């Protein structure tokens, strides 16, 4: 009798697995988790927005998605996304992104931003506190409605701040951190009036809360003094003396041909215990505002670019000096695409293991729609310079680990493990690709077959499901 019971237990054990029914089961996909190194055919059980089971055994679910022949990975996390309109969110979802955050220069009113997005977001969202906005307020300058960046020639962009103005900025940033900001965002190239001391004082605000600083460095080209090397050294130094963690954004465009040298500085800082991280996007052209301080006199010598390297995104028009002067002096913010790098340089950047992926996404540039699928198509499938595991790590786990300095909620993102949030991308490695171009920047990527945000299916069979808004806010420590 004892042996019979034992035999029955062995025979029925697979059935016990099936007795647990999940809200949704992803069946038979190649499951990849960059933290544990899992790369195997598995079934994934999801309930109540969480991954509850990953098993080689069959699982039962009220809904089953067949993922045979497909990759099942953690949803991609974009730490550098400007556009938050619904169309941009759709493009992000079709690019495999489950979380997109405005971390570079932040939002001017964090509470208002979070309230405006609640219940209306396809994907997860969040923001830093904006130093450019705090600076504009300290100088009594209205914050531009179409851009947080102060216009070239204004006091908020060009003038050094008084001690009183620096204190006003710090108070504003603390207020925004209290409202749920995930750190401090700075755009130093757009505010050349910022002194080295002001930089350190802003880093101190982040360090008070053990939060990171995300910064666009001054990016002044190869010329000394003030080169890209000096720009990166400046913010690493501020991190060292204050203890704030630091994320340097889009090193591909900020440092150009000097990107590898700048990456060596970052590697050296990390080897000595500093929390310095870095991201990039896989395109040779940048995009910014033409009436910003980035185009102050001397910009051509610093960047190595010409007027003809500037293109209006809406028309494809290449600029002349006369057209540049007209647009630069306009009171209306206008975006411009700047062809100032090469894909050869960009490719080298992404081979570096320190570099994670972020889009710097904004309408009118293909990076808004295609960044993440482009990584898979270009570097994994076409060039073979990244393994699939490494590419997924750069797009999920690495940004999640940066976010862990801002919010414990990030510990459950960027992983495909039991207990993690069910933010999941399912894609076809043979067909996944970006389709957006400089001429047609709104073309969605293809190859993402399914996307889950918090367990809710947002993309099904390559099509966005309309009318569902599962995105949730990620907020800083002080808000919880």
Per-region residue spans from a language model:
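Active-site-adjacent beta->alpha loops and helix N-cap segments on the catalytic face
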Residues: 107-112, 193-202
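Divalent-metal coordination cores built from histidine and acidic residues
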Residues: 66-72, 86-185, 274
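Active-site microenvironment of metallo-dependent hydrolases
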Residues: 4-7, 17-42, 47, 56, ...
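Alpha-helix-loop-beta-strand connector modules within alpha/beta enzyme cores
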Residues: 120-125, 200-215, 241
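Charged helix-capping and loop-helix junction motifs
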Residues: 197-201, 229-234, 371
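Active-site neighborhoods of metal-dependent hydrolases
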Residues: 137-194, 236-240, 244-245, 249-388
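Hydrophobic faces of well-ordered beta-strands that scaffold small-molecule active sites
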Residues: 75-81, 100-102, 125-129, 184-186, ...
